[in-house]
Structures are given as C-alpha cells and as structure tokens.
C-alpha cells in the first residue's frame, strides 16, 4: 500500500476534543520540515539545473491536480509581485484548468495526454523545465506530461510523498518527501500539501536569488501594488542610500522599483 494511503496513526478522531485534534495535527506537521530537509540534495540538484536554463530565457512549468495543482498555481502567481518577474517565467498548470482552482473537475486528472497538450500551447522548448507535483505520484495528467517532455529533451522534476512512484520513473530529478500517513487517512492536502508548499517556496526563491532578483535580503524588484509595499520599498531606499523618507519615496515612484531607483541615484551621483 502507498504511504499516502496508509491508515492514520490516530483513530476515533470524532471522540477527541478540539485541543487534542489540534495538538495531534501539530505533532504530525512537525515531521514535514524534517522530511523536506532530507530532500534538500535533490532540490539543490534541480535548482542548479534550472538556473542556467532560465538565464537563457527558459521557464518553469508546475503541473498538478487538486491540491498539488493549486499549490503550483499559487507559487507561480507569487513570482511577479515578489520578484518583479513577468508571469510567463513560472507558470502553474492544473488539471481541469482555472475552474479546478475552486471546484473539482471530474476526470480531469485521469487524462494522460492533456498535460502535454497544454504544454505545447506554450511552445515549450529545451530551455524550459517541467515539475510534476503529486503526493501519490500516480496522477496520469502529470505522468503523461513528464513522459512527453522528457522525450523532447526537456528537464523534468517531480515532488511526491511516495517512494518509487510511476511519476518518479518519468522525472530526471526526483524529490521524494516521505511525510508518512496523513492525520485523516488519505487526506494528502495536509502533510503532503504542506511539504509541497515548502519545497515550491525553496525552488522558486532560490532560483530568483540566483537570477539576481534579491539584493542583500531584500525584494528590490517587487511590484509596488499597494501602500504597504510602497512604504517597504521607501524604507529599503532610505537604508541603502541614507536619504530621508520623502526623497526616497519620490525616487521610488519615479523609477518604479527599488533596484532601479537605487541604480539611478548612484549613477547620478557618479556623473
């Protein structure tokens, strides 16, 4: 039996108090970070292969169904506001399309050919990377996409919670995050989903840092989409250049990003 389908270590959940349930879930969640830690060498291997491809104009495609697909779309959607990258650089695809973000689409994940068909609509090429996400490691939508991508010489990776899965057989880099049985038997939105989110954070953040989208520890390319972020950017410029608030904010709004504002100011001081 797959680990993700094994019975929970806990039983008679309906007889437990709220406090007991919360403590049980928290106890299980503490296992997730340790499982992710064990997978760091494989995560590193994947990132090290992604970065040179992206420097040549490559993209990352996350592919999943259900919770796994939603998490891929979520991570991809955070890249433009956080790092100021175009939304075409990291793309999340979910079985059933955007409708499936809110509502289950019956049978969508069982279509072995649909995933690759969607990738071809993006004119996928050998500079790109496809990362399959599936706790079970058995999702046909993902497996079919990885298989075809690999045939076309495209880098493939996968994130799964079961060892030696069919999905892993189709990936160049296999990230196995073995978190054990779920608190509610088979509910892989729980520990598996938490671990997937952690790994996706690690992949996208480390890639963006390697691509120069962070300076020091700051999001110097973030989009200025609300007052909070304008103020954060203003503080970054104040700290970096020693300017007062009004001068820093004027520079920021003039140039549109922290990085461009700092670069423009330093250029003006040197010339």
Cite the ranges covered by each PLM segment.
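Short, basic, glycine/proline-bearing loop/turn elements
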Residues: 28-38, 104, 130-132
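Glycine-rich phosphate-binding loops that contact phosphosugars or nucleotide phosphates
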Residues: 61, 65-198, 207-211
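Charged, alpha-helix-enriched surfaces in structured cytosolic catalytic cores
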Residues: 41, 45, 140, 194, ...
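Short glycine/serine/threonine/alanine-rich loop segments
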Residues: 58, 154, 243
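A short, well-structured juxtamembrane/interface segment
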Residues: 38-53
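Cofactor-/ligand-binding subdomain signature composed of acidic, glycine-rich
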Residues: 1-35
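Short, amphipathic alpha-helical interaction segments embedded in low-complexity terminal/linker regions
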Residues: 207-271
């Amino acid at each position: 039996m797959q680990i993700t389908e094994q019975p929970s270590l806990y039983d008679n959940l309906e007889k437990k108090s709220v406090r007991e349930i919360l403590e049980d879930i928290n106890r299980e969640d503490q296992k997730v970070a340790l499982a992710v830690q064990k997978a760091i060498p494989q995560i590193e291997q994947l990132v090290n292969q992604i970065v040179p491809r992206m420097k040549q104009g490559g993209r990352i495609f996350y592919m999943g169904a259900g919770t796994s697909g939603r998490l891929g779309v979520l991570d991809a959607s955070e890249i433009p506001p956080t790092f100021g990258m175009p939304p075409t650089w990291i793309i999340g695809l979910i079985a059933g399309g955007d409708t499936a973000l809110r509502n289950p689409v019956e049978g969508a994940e069982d279509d072995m050919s649909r995933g690759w068909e969607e990738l071809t609509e993006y004119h996928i090429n050998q500079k790109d990377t496809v990362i399959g996400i599936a706790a079970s490691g058995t999702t046909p939508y993902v497996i079919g996409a990885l298989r075809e991508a690999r045939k076309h010489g495209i880098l493939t990776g996968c994130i799964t919670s079961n060892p030696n899965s069919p999905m892993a057989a189709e990936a160049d880099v296999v990230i196995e995050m073995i978190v054990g049985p779920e608190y509610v038997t088979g509910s892989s939105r729980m520990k598996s989903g938490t671990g997937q989110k952690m790994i996706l954070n690690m992949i996208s953040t480390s890639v963006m840092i390697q691509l120069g989208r962070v300076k020091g520890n700051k999001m110097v390319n973030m989009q200025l989409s609300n007052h909070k972020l304008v103020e954060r950017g203003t503080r970054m410029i104040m700290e970096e250049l020693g300017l007062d608030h009004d001068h820093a904010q004027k520079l920021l709004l003039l140039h549109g990003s922290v990085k461009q504002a700092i670069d423009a100011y330093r250029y003006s001081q040197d010339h």
